[in-house]
């Protein structure tokens, strides 16, 4: 199976490696959460130019490298590997920069003061996500496998386990 060489991609990105990481991540999350868009980008019967144009419409501020990368994935029928690419490129960024990824998930967009408080005890590159399913609170997941669940959903699940034992 053909795949993108993430090391070469990192070298090509140069000083824009972190920006590219964020762009790849955001686009992969968009496709992950939107079945219709995912189907559109993966459908080889839709002309490649139409799919590339859609990327520009969705992300008009995307970098030239990002547009060329997605164009390459479309042309080579590798767009299905975008999730894999996002994951492995992010891991490479962590190794190269020494800044591990920390994913912070909340039920709604956090106010800046709460973000700053979380940033005080987390080190590395941080990604803030919104997932209404956690009801309230936050979940923090470190790239090294550590996990803190201070969400209301997590507390309710723990309470359910205690009661059912």
PLM region descriptions:
Residues 1-165:
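Elongated, mostly alpha-helical coiled-coil "stalk/stator" tethers of large membrane protein machines
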């Amino acid at each position: 199976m053909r795949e993108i060489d993430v090391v070469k991609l990192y070298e090509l990105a140069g000083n824009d490696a972190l920006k590219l990481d964020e762009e790849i991540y955001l686009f992969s999350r968009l496709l992950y959460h939107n079945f219709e868009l995912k189907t559109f980008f993966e459908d080889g019967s839709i002309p490649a130019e139409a799919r590339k144009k859609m990327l520009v419409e969705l992300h008009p501020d995307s970098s030239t490298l990002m547009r060329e990368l997605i164009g390459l994935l479309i042309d080579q029928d590798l767009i299905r590997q975008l999730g894999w690419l996002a994951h492995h490129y992010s891991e490479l960024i962590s190794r190269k920069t020494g800044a591990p990824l920390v994913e912070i998930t909340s039920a709604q967009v956090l106010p800046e003061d709460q973000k700053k408080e979380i940033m005080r005890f987390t080190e590395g590159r941080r990604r803030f996500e919104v997932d209404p399913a956690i009801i309230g609170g936050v979940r923090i997941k470190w790239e090294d496998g550590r996990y803190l669940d201070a969400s209301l959903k997590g507390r309710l699940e723990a309470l359910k386990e205690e009661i059912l034992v």
